[in-house]
Amino acid sequence: FMHVTNGKLGNLQLPGAGLTTTELASVRQGLMDAASQSSERDMNELKKFDGFLRDHPWRFTAVVDGPNVAYLNQNYDGGRFRPLQIKAVVDVLEARGHRVLVTLPAKYCEAVVPNHSKFATPLPSQEAEQALDEEEIALLEAWRMRGMLYAVPRACHDDLYWILGTTYNC
């Protein structure tokens, strides 16, 4: 759920590090193909993100898949989406000198977000929601203002975005 482009995070060797330019281009094309199989809109939205990455004033050296981090260890009664868990990862990466990009589905960039932890609802047919507190809302806004938060459009597959983000500085 996290990729650091120098190939290591602490003592953990990451599997995608060191791909050739040709291999990275192939990964990018595969992601575009996957998006186009879903819909033309999905492909166009992913192309916009590709443009965001190419045109951004700096290169990101770490990409954080926000939902996976925010829901880490939250499958218990009372578990919830926790932006402060994302902040903890971002803070460590920035302290190590990385320029961090956080990807989050747009539905998690609002004041009220879905809660998809295992014990969020008593019945699978119900969707629980949770209100973010002021600190969590301010955190998302701060990341947005710093240009390090990308809100994946609704109904788009967010995994394609963080994976694409990792292909620009490997």
Task: Please report, for each region that a protein language model flagged, where it lies by residue.
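Noncatalytic, typically N-terminal accessory segments of nucleic acid-processing enzymes
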Residues: 1-170
